[in-house]
Amino acid sequence: MDHKKFESLIKQLYSTVNELESMFPGRHFTPDGHMVGSIGESLVADAYGLELMTASNKGFDATSTTGKQIEIKASQARSAAFRSEPEHAIVIKILPDGSFEEIYNGPGSLIWRQFSDKPLPNNGQYQISLNKLKILNEQVVESMRVPRVI
């Protein structure tokens, strides 16, 4: 894959969003839903050298070169949602310029423990704030992280 072309296309997309929002004040053109998920999964797969599974794969989105199953969560808001305990999770926040900030990169068990005393929400998804994930990320030792390749 052409990493530079991919990066350029994502930046163009977010630049277009910013231009449209400037042209039409009060209107939001922010990508959401499946588009954000697919963009996030692609950004992470590219940056960490992961192999993506088919879309909507149950339980994980990609595998690492060592075979680790990775759930990828991308947000433009303040939280991420989990339906089940992942083996490993990488959570990112997509920034307005199309780049991303790594919020969490570590074992899924550390996240899942946060839900242990909570009833399952009606929508079947536990929510966790990006701020809480940043705090949890500080507890992850380097050897437990999936390293970036670019």
Positions of predicted regions on the chain:
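Nucleic-acid endonuclease domains
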Residues: 1-150
